[in-house]
From Swiss-Prot:
Residues 23-297 form the CNH domain. Keywords: Cytoplasm, Endosome. Plays a role in the TGF-beta signaling pathway. Plays a role in vesicle-mediated protein trafficking of the endocytic membrane transport pathway. Believed to act as a component of the putative CORVET endosomal tethering complexes which is proposed to be involved in the Rab5-to-Rab7 endosome conversion probably implicating MON1A/B, and via binding SNAREs and SNARE complexes to mediate tethering and docking events during SNARE-mediated membrane fusion. The CORVET complex is proposed to function as a Rab5 effector to mediate early endosome fusion probably in specific endosome subpopulations. InterPro entries: Clathrin_H-chain/VPS_repeat, CNH_dom, Vam6/VPS39/TRAP1, VPS39/TGF_beta_rcpt-assoc_1, VPS39/TGFA1_Znf. It comes from the Eukaryota. This is Transforming growth factor-beta receptor-associated protein 1 homolog. It holds the Pfam family CNH. Belongs to the TRAP1 family. It is found in: Cytoplasm; Early endosome. The lineage of its organism: Eukaryota, Metazoa, Chordata, Craniata, Vertebrata.
């Protein structure tokens, strides 16, 4: 696609070159700064001074002042001109010979050394390798020789350094460092004249079409290839850029980055080196020459000279953006980096990215737009401002000037298409959600969060609650009316809470729960309000709303008090006694709160335990008196009472006994209370003779002795056995229950005591399990004690051994030392030691040990 990259501006008019001579043609051109040199076919060199100026319309124009012209006296065309500005010399190719003239006077300069004649072409090394600032490196092609000569031009001489042979006669060449790019008769090649390495490129017929060899950068060349292609090649012979497709009849080419300019018989064409596309075509008749000089592009016909003035890259980029050619604009922007100072480029690049983002935004290409906004570090308020009423009224934002886009607002952009409106809103939601936690939003979090809240509210987005429940910068003055407008009352309560207005938040939520306001956002809002109050540090608010919550649902409402954290500051704590007093009119809530204090928080206060036990007892008695009570209800209530009576030791037992004394259904509870008073005989009497539940009696014994020693447990079971065997109670002794008790718990009883209690008429088989168990327990106890005694003796012996070991020193035994018992010497190292460390024979000690009982008996007979 086309873009205007250059303006064609006249530089030297026809009359300034030709004068009155009709047959004068321009053969070559050279430009050095403001100085322009022309070589003509009549062997003249013309020297012009080009001065730039800007017209009234802002266009660039040139004034050409002719300073001098010089006739070389050879009557041959001047074929080539090259300036050596450091030497103030002009190298001239005329009549197959190279001469050097002064750049100012155009007078020939004597050159000692090599005489360069028979030259068909030459080029200057723009990447010299000699390191001498006061000489120019040059490559020369000689007629009818398959060679290239490397020379240096000094102020007063021309010196040949090296001659490099080539496979064929060179037609054209270009030089960069040690690398010579050559157009031979049938092909292009690259030759390193330092190493001798060469690389064939591709075939080309020089007789059919004029070759083009153009250095375009460090170790890179542009070549005219068959098929109307401009090929790029580096020093290794590799093309790192795609070729450009130009005319078959191109006669010259130049490079003005990022463009390749080509000249044919009727046109100047401009291709991009970045995407190889044709960007501009300029009509130019009788074109003869095209050269680039230090960023300038000069094109000449046979009679006049023109300048191709590149338009500023920024203007080219803006033209591309105006045509919505985003990728081309971005590519050109990145290519411009090499020609623009770093800071200026960064500013330009960011702006172009932002503009590109808005173009793609308008085309609904949201992924690309988002990426360009991110890379361009867009002030997100530029985007928000397109959406009516999203920016807070207090925002000081004004749009960038010049503007980054052509849109007035979202309505202008969508033209009333509601589907597009929703797509644009979804994009902004996504984008704001990403940037609000990044550096992009620094400095204007209020604008971002407020806009995001408004979008969430009007689209009923699920993230509205997440935004308000987390850290945010939403402005209350702007956000509250918006939430109310869109009936987001629960969210409005969250906003009030975040801004420290808990009273307003609770008022809003209570209205929703009561049905005064319609908002189905949170079906469990009542539970949420209760939970909120349980964490609220403002006790005035807690007490103000507690009665409302308890009237709604006591079971849930009491959680205001039961879920309240204990780690809060003291000002946020509630006194338990005050809560109990407050809950007197809410019986279910009071019971739940006392359960919380006693069973969950494990508070060890008698009044709480007693109060809870009394409430449990009253509830059970109430259920008993109610005919409609189900068995499950009564059983559950009794289990709670029984559990508390057994596990707690803090309640007032006598008070509870008085409460349940008259109930014939609460015998198990009465027995438990007697047990708490250590009245085990009464408890067992109730269980055995009134409740008639032997299993309950045995469980009672196990429960009552659980934290006691074995003797206490044994006495309690003996007491139960005595109750079973008591013949004076109605019904007489309970033989079966007694036998079952003995057989099941044989290990608990003292068998001797039991046998004394049992009637003599009981048969032995009846008590066999008990007696076997008792015998087994006795034998086990005896064996266990013997094992323990043996272990103790072994341990004692080991300790004595260790003691002797650590107290005694080494025992010396030798053939000269005798045994203290038999007085014979030792013949081997084995020995025993008497107390004191005296060594003796082992057999002597054994014999002494056998004699000791006899001696002891003898002594005892005489005492």
């Amino acid at each position: 696609m086309s873009v205007k990259a250059f303006d064609l501006v006249p530089a030297v008019e026809r009359e300034q070159v030709m004068g009155e001579k009709v047959r004068i043609n321009i053969e070559c051109i050279e430009c050095c700064g403001q100085h322009l040199y022309l070589g003509t076919n009549d062997c003249f060199i013309h020297h012009f001074l080009l001065e730039e100026h800007t017209t009234a319309k802002g266009k660039l124009a040139f004034n050409a002042q002719k300073l001098l012209h010089k006739y070389l006296g050879l009557k041959k065309p001047v074929v080539e001109l090259k300036a050596a500005s450091a030497l103030e010399r002009l190298i001239v190719l005329c009549d197959s010979a190279i001469t050097v003239v002064d750049m100012v006077t155009l007078e020939p300069v004597p050159t000692g050394g090599a005489k360069l004649k028979g030259v068909t072409a030459f080029c200057i090394n723009e990447n010299p390798v000699t390191g001498d600032a006061f000489c120019v490196e040059m490559a020369v092609v000689l007629a009818r020789r398959r060679a290239v000569q490397i020379c240096t031009v000094h102020e007063d001489r021309v010196q040949m350094l090296k001659e490099v042979t080539t496979p064929e006669q060179p037609c054209a060449l270009s030089l960069d460092g040690y690398n010579i790019c050559l157009a031979l008769s049938t092909q292009y090649m690259i030759l390193n004249y330092s190493t001798g390495a060469s690389q064939d490129l591709f075939p080309y017929d020089c007789e059919e079409r004029k070759p083009i060899v153009k250095r375009i950068g460090r170790e890179e060349f542009l070549l005219a290839a068959p098929g109307g292609l401009g090929m790029f090649a580096n020093a290794e012979g590799i093309s790192q850029r795609a070729p450009v497709s130009w005319s078959e009849n191109v006669i010259a080419a130049a490079v003005c980055f990022p463009y390749v300019v080509a000249l044919d018989e009727g046109f100047v064409t401009v291709h991009s080196m970045l995407d190889q596309q044709l960007k501009q075509t300029l009509s130019f008749r009788d074109g003869q020459l095209l050269q680039d000089f230090e960023g300038k592009v000069v094109v000449a016909s046979s009679k006049a000279v023109y300048m191709l003035v590149p338009l500023p890259l920024e203007r080219q980029i803006q033209d591309l953006l105006a045509s919505h050619r985003v990728e081309e604009a971005l590519t050109l922007t990145e290519a411009a980096q090499r020609n623009i100072p770093k800071e200026k480029y960064q500013i330009l690049h960011r702006r172009i990215l932002q503009q590109a983002g808005f173009i793609q935004f308008g085309q609904l290409q949201f992924l690309e737009a988002k990426e360009h906004f991110r890379k361009g570090q867009l002030d997100v308020r530029e985007l928000i401002s397109l959406y009516p009423l999203l920016l807070p009224a207090s925002s000081s934002f004004t749009r960038c000037h010049p503007p980054l886009h052509e849109f007035a607002d979202l309505n202008h952009l969508t033209q009333g298409d509601q589907e597009k409106v929703q797509r644009f809103k979804r994009f902004l939601i996504s984008y704001l959600h990403e940037v609000r936690s990044s550096d992009i939003a620094n400095g204007f979090h209020e604008d971002v969060d407020t806009a995001l809240l408004k979008l969430y509210a009007e689209t009923s987005h699920e993230s509205l609650l997440d935004l308000l429940a987390s850290e945010n910068a939403c402005l209350l003055a702007d956000s509250a009316p918006w939430l109310e407008k869109h009936h987001k009352y629960y969210a409005l309560g969250l906003l009030y809470h975040y801004n420290g207005q808990d009273a307003a938040a609770l008022q809003m939520w209570v209205k929703i729960v009561n049905g005064d306001l319609q908002d189905s956002t949170r079906p469990d809002l009542f539970e949420y309000v209760v939970d909120f109050l349980s964490f609220c540090s403002n006790l005035d608010l807690v007490w103000r709303h507690a009665d409302w919550a308890l009237q709604k649902d006591q079971k849930i409402g009491v959680q205001i008090f039961t879920k309240r954290p204990t780690s809060e500051e003291r000002r946020g704590q509630l006194n338990a006694d005050d809560v109990i007093t407050y809950l007197q009119k809410h019986s279910q809530a009071l019971l739940l709160y006392l359960e919380h204090l006693v069973l969950e928080k494990k508070l060890q206060k008698e009044k709480y335990h007693t109060h809870l036990a009394v409430l449990y007892a009253e509830k059970v008695l109430g259920l008993i008196s109610r005919p409609s009570t189900s068995e499950e209800q009564l059983s559950a209530a009794r289990q709670k009472l029984q559990r508390l009576l057994k596990e707690s030791n803090l309640y007032r037992v006598q008070l509870l006994l008085g409460k349940i004394q008259d109930s014939e259904l609460l015998l198990l509870e009465r027995a438990t209370l007697h047990g708490k008073l250590e009245e085990h005989d009464k408890a067992l009497h109730v269980l055995v003779h009134q409740l008639k539940d032997s299993s309950a009696a045995e469980e009672y014994c196990s429960w009552a002795s659980a934290s006691q020693d074995s003797s206490y447990r044994q006495n309690l079971f003996h007491q139960l056995l005595s109750v079973y065997l008591d013949p004076d109670v109605p019904g007489g002794a309970q033989t079966v229950a007694a036998v079952d008790l003995l057989n099941r718990h044989a290990e608990v009883f003292d068998a001797v005591r039991v046998l004394k209690l049992l009637p003599e008429d009981w048969s032995l088989p009846l008590l066999r399990p008990f007696l076997c168990g008792a015998m087994r327990a006795t034998v086990h106890a005896r064996c266990t004690s013997q094992v323990a005694l043996g272990l103790a003796r072994a341990q004692n012996l080991q300790l004595l051994h260790d003691r002797l070991k650590y107290r005694g020193g080494p025992v010396l035994v030798s053939e000269k030392k005798g045994c203290q018992l038999c007085h014979n010497t030792f013949s081997e190292p084995d020995c025993a030691c008497l107390p004191g460390g005296t060594p003796v024979h082992i057999n002597c000690v054994a014999k002494k040990a056998l004699d000791l009982p006899h001696e002891n008996a003898h002594h005892s007979n005489h005492t």
